[in-house]
Amino acid sequence: EHDLMYPPDPGEKTGSLGGNVSTNAGGMRAVKYGTTRDYVLAMTVVLPNGQILELGRSVTKTSSGYSLLHLMIGSEGTLGVITELTLKLIPNPKEDISFILPFADIDAAISAVPKIKLAGLSPQSIEFMERDIVDSSANYTGNKIIPTVIDGKEAGAYILVTLDGNDQDEIFQRAETLAEIGDEIGAYDT
């Protein structure tokens, strides 16, 4: 309705915001947007002794001593039960595009990640997938979406990169740069 999003999108869609905050979850978009901690402005917490604390403020910057708010984030319920949250939302990017970069093996895929991050592409997410996962998914769904042999070469691992933004042309420019980087770092079929 307001075209806003909560960036630390947890992979588990049945998860709660309280659980998300209790574990300081990051989700796939943490690469670009950070983790839950970056989006919690305030919370109400019930301590084990029954005391109710109102922590934080509905503004981003505060400097009034220790941050009990940030101590609660990621404490997994050991310090108290979160009953209310005030979260920061950001404008939802209008466009996104995802790429699967296949590599010969796990080492090649893993070594590609820092190069992609350092290229200034500002990826929304970078995910690693082993060949076994791709094969298992294809067997389970009966649909082989991701190729395992590219130009006669076996892919042993994959990197899934998502780029997002508000300007489609700018995203396509970053996508071209990603394809060039893919060629330089040994990705198949970029």
Question: What are the functions of these language-model segments?
Answer:
Residues 1-190:
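Noncatalytic alpha-helical scaffold of FAD-dependent oxidoreductases
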